[in-house]
Amino acid sequence: MAYEQLKYDVLEKEGHIEIRKYAPFVMMKSGSPSYSGFQVLFSYISGYNSKKQKINMTVPVFTDVKESGYIAFTMPEEVVKEGYPEALDPRINIEKQEEKTYVSYSYVGSIKKVDTVIKILQDYVDNKGLKVQGDPVLLRYQGPMVPPIFRKHDVMLEITF
């Protein structure tokens, strides 16, 4: 099954590293990066919302790399155009994201590499004279049924020039 994927433009590419510009988008966010946070969001897209509307899953799933972070799904473009339903669960925040630029490192494998990848990105940003804004973000593209060695991930830092 193919999922709608969040669109972006690649401004620069160097090996595994890309500078990406994301157009404005809408995300639904839960304050827990764990399985329980995923379940809260999944219930929203399964119809537990103000319109009882089922919403297609999208990729990637955004997660904060901190233990006390968040998990977020992006809203499909068609649902945004038609008007998305309000969340009934108070643990869900629906947020409009403005256009943003990120430096991203893509890889396949375990999320255990995240700290190493963040260091690689930070060195890249420092060498290019870019400024980081906010905390690192981990993007996940496959679910738990895919063996970890085959899972695609992006680690991103929001940047300003």
Indicate where each model-derived feature is located.
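A solvent-exposed interaction/effector surface
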Residues: M1-F161
